[in-house]
Curated annotation (Swiss-Prot):
Region (Mediates dimerization): 885-1332
Entry function: Component of the elongator complex which is required for multiple tRNA modifications, including mcm5U (5-methoxycarbonylmethyl uridine), mcm5s2U (5-methoxycarbonylmethyl-2-thiouridine), and ncm5U (5-carbamoylmethyl uridine). The elongator complex catalyzes the formation of carboxymethyluridine in the wobble base at position 34 in tRNAs. Regulates the migration and branching of projection neurons in the developing cerebral cortex, through a process depending on alpha-tubulin acetylation. ELP1 binds to tRNA, mediating interaction of the elongator complex with tRNA.
InterPro entries xref list: A-sol_ELP1 (IPR056167), Elp1 (IPR006849), ELP1_b-prop_2 (IPR056165), ELP1_N_b-prop_1 (IPR056164), HB_ELP1 (IPR056169), TPR_ELP1 (IPR056166), WD40/YVTN_repeat-like_dom_sf (IPR015943)
UniProt-annotated stretches for the region Required for binding to tRNA: 1191-1209
A GO term for molecular function: tRNA binding
Compositional bias annotation for Polar residues: 1164-1177
Protein's GO biological process: regulation of translation; tRNA wobble base 5-methoxycarbonylmethyl-2-thiouridinylation; tRNA wobble uridine modification
Outcome of substituting P914L: In HSAN3; reduced interaction with ELP2; does not affect interaction with ELP3; does not affect dimerization
Protein name: Elongator complex protein 1
Amino acid sequence: MRNLKLFRTLEFRDIQGPGNPQCFSLRTEQGTVLIGSEHGLIEVDPVSREVKNEVSLVAEGFLPEDGSGRIVGVQDLLDQESVCVATASGDVILCSLSTQQLECVGSVASGISVMSWSPDQELVLLATGQQTLIMMTKDFEPILEQQIHQDDFGESKFITVGWGRKETQFHGSEGRQAAFQMQMHESALPWDDHRPQVTWRGDGQFFAVSVVCPETGARKVRVWNREFALQSTSEPVAGLGPALAWKPSGSLIASTQDKPNQQDIVFFEKNGLLHGHFTLPFLKDEVKVNDLLWNADSSVLAVWLEDLQREESSIPKTCVQLWTVGNYHWYLKQSLSFSTCGKSKIVSLMWDPVTPYRLHVLCQGWHYLAYDWHWTTDRSVGDNSSDLSNVAVIDGNRVLVTVFRQTVVPPPMCTYQLLFPHPVNQVTFLAHPQKSNDLAVLDASNQISVYKCGDCPSADPTVKLGAVGGSGFKVCLRTPHLEKRYKIQFENNEDQDVNPLKLGLLTWIEEDVFLAVSHSEFSPRSVIHHLTAASSEMDEEHGQLNVSSSAAVDGVIISLCCNSKTKSVVLQLADGQIFKYLWESPSLAIKPWKNSGGFPVRFPYPCTQTELAMIGEEECVLGLTDRCRFFINDIEVASNITSFAVYDEFLLLTTHSHTCQCFCLRDASFKTLQAGLSSNHVSHGEVLRKVERGSRIVTVVPQDTKLVLQMPRGNLEVVHHRALVLAQIRKWLDKLMFKEAFECMRKLRINLNLIYDHNPKVFLGNVETFIKQIDSVNHINLFFTELKEEDVTKTMYPAPVTSSVYLSRDPDGNKIDLVCDAMRAVMESINPHKYCLSILTSHVKKTTPELEIVLQKVHELQGNAPSDPDAVSAEEALKYLLHLVDVNELYDHSLGTYDFDLVLMVAEKSQKDPKEYLPFLNTLKKMETNYQRFTIDKYLKRYEKAIGHLSKCGPEYFPECLNLIKDKNLYNEALKLYSPSSQQYQDISIAYGEHLMQEHMYEPAGLMFARCGAHEKALSAFLTCGNWKQALCVAAQLNFTKDQLVGLGRTLAGKLVEQRKHIDAAMVLEECAQDYEEAVLLLLEGAAWEEALRLVYKYNRLDIIETNVKPSILEAQKNYMAFLDSQTATFSRHKKRLLVVRELKEQAQQAGLDDEVPHGQESDLFSETSSVVSGSEMSGKYSHSNSRISARSSKNRRKAERKKHSLKEGSPLEDLALLEALSEVVQNTENLKDEVYHILKVLFLFEFDEQGRELQKAFEDTLQLMERSLPEIWTLTYQQNSATPVLGPNSTANSIMASYQQQKTSVPVLDAELFIPPKINRRTQWKLSLLD
């Protein structure tokens, strides 16, 4: 759905050359044009408008002096740096333009009618006057000469196997005689010059020749290969014209055919068979086709037509039409009308071989024109809902308009057509936000037709409905009407005949103001014209556009774009300069466009598409070259962009990687766009979408989510880009347009949680608005069913940073319950009968489904059927519930209501067999109420409720209750049901205590026994756990004798010593057994020096100090010294070995020997197909979900795992084992501080100063050694490696592998804690200053 838009015009008038031009050729490397006349050659530079060279062929005798000579071909030879010229008299001349030397390389006596070079310039073909073809090499060595007329079909002759012949086919009403009719051959067309026509395929492997057959007088097309072997001959085609052009891509050969009532362009295949056609918009014998020309990329077919003289008074015209194909339909995109009189008559034209869309035209009066076109999509530019998203496609004298807001029809179909008396060349839409549907059309007669959307009193005959029309259908579409046709008058009318496309880049900026650009024919300058409508009271249908003002620009303007919001107009020159045109200024100033830094903007390469857009707070120029390079101002942000469009605050682009990317420009910057579009950047979320190969953007429907793409063949595809969808939904939600948002989300499968998560407070405050707008029970139920606790604005649809969703977060409470309760309250207040099913859904959807309430409501419906017409019956409600809840679960909950009518109602709707549930229900009905409910609760495994009902059944049922309590561990719940003074309470307490004893929870068991009066069992429990204080309390309650207390005390002391509670054991011995001597010995054994001295002095046994206390202190000091020496030696040895191991690993890594990963439980980390944790580890570590895992057991497990590290030299994880050992040494030494402090005090007290200083010095040296070594052992590099987040929810096997390779270490993840250095607390007081 693209049009050809005139890019620029290069014009060189009145070239000073002798005679009349006859043909021309291009010198692409020099950028010059070679023109041949009856006198010789002339080389001109159309850019500088200078004559470079002039070579006379008359002086050398190659052309006659009387001017009757003719040049039939000119070809620039790149590798020979010369020009080859063929004359009609038969001479082939090689001309060097640099030296102006002429060399006749060959001569044909019968004359030459055609000279045609192969595309690779390796071969040249000459058609002679004797109807022969001569093929020569590029060095003009003859290869072969053959007759141009051949009797044979060619090497590709079709093979007939006997069936399927014409004689055996059905011929309809003509009968069998049609099979035997003689083929009637029509002679060549009257205006045919009978000259042969030659065309080459793009790769130079074949060429085709069109000649008039001497036998039949009709034209035939023959195909030859590069070896000059005839391949095929075309089938007989009546009225075949002389024009011939082989499509460069090699698929088809174009020619013309005159039919009884029309004139067609027909296409031949290489085998000579016809393959498709299209009809020219002329009557029979109205025009003749002089030539057909394909452009370099085979996308445009130029048709050179000339009027046939019918009336002497009429002035014949010459026309050049440009045709393109899309979706198997041929479009007439441009029509250039020249006069055949005087200097404006076309002599020759050709496409540029390098620039595909550049057409060169040579006119009779030494007038040269070069037109550059580019593809453009003409679409309306509004950004509000009133814009219909119109796209206009030029097709001859029709403009096909498709309204994408209401209809999406594939081309060549359209919504409606605009009909014109002349072919259309340009279409432009009004750059006004509120009137963007109005359009203006410039046709080949330089008339501008203005169409406006609005009320029209009568049907417009120039507007014809397309795909939306039909008999008996009501058209719900606003079609435009022709407001007026304006004629543009030029100061020099001759200019229009010489250059039919005088005005280009037509832009409609205001309702009565047009901008257009023309180019100077004498210098590289451009002029911007202001076209304003002249007031005309006489003629309402026709008017005139006056050039109210003009502004000259030094340079060739190649693009002009306008921002409909800011009204900024930007010009682009051929050299890439960007200017801002102040069209509203009286002086019509033109100044350079500057970026935010104040520097002029200049595109590095000319851009064929330019747009204006606001990026952040800056208005920028966006440009796309024909080489897919995309620029923002003068910064190239991408080089793989195939199309782009600016809509509101979004920039949409399609890329060569078959993706469509959408960026929000509001908060974007050049760097973010460049990073997002770079090939190495991986886009996520709503930015990127995969599209079909070769897709291009057609338009974006404003205030909607539709993005229209066109495929290379021409068919359309409508996609809803996630970024556009979410942006539009957020706008609707901000405006409380819940219905529009809901319908869009439901259709495009957007998670409905976004309605709430976008702004929870606003939603909860407008629940009534939401329900009234949706107004559908099914839709509300759908919303309920999709609710989940997840915040989709953080997971699925992250909102822009500036979105209000970050300013208003979730209210306190459970999301699902909040929404369900809020909506249910509103629905019950509006119409509880209408929204009955939704109310039931709100109960079911809650975090803890309220099925009992739901069943109760259904039961109420059964008993009291509402009279409201919107109400649902109990049967319908129950049937709906069975879709939400499993029938067995619903049956169980109905049973839990103890309402047998409700149970029967649910059971009848289920698939249960009545033989299964009726006997059970009948049995229940016969039971006493409490025991019945107990039985139901036990059946439903609601044991807490069951024992509550059973406790009310009487003492005779207590044994059954106690057994259930023991089986289901319901002791705490059961104790709440009985009075503490009751026997049942005591029995349950004893059973509870025994249960705790079995679970090795001895202290709670003792407390439970003591509470219920079971003192003997309580004493046993306290003895087992070592709670000597409670044990003595229970002993007092049991009235123990003195001997019993002594025995109990010694037993307790023994258990406490086993638990290394020496102080507690000493206290028990002192109080119960009055054995203070044994108590002192226990205290000395436990290093409780001060407590031991207290007892010595309390009982005045100073002799014990000399006999026991002092020796114990000195022995302890020696032990501490030996321990410190051992720790210091171990620490130094491990540290030294660790440095050696690390150095060896670094050397191995540098040598590339660390590729193999150590075998072990983490080896699966490095496999692309394995999980992070191996199976055995998973089994051993995560299979305890049904058991109690204490912090201590987890710690012990980790400790056991670390012990797998071996300190054996050379082991794979030796460095980890050394780190583990060093950390353990440091921690053990740190834990000695308190013990050292206490022994230092008693050493000083008993005047053992030397031993105290020795111990204090040794401990201080050990701590300093370890503190100095910590940074060397636990280096920063190893800590960072361990802190790197290798694993996580977004990690993959490849990312984990890459992370580990970057770390250059094979450290298992489970041992990352080993890289955290142990802490040495300097604030801990251990040193005794008295010993300094």
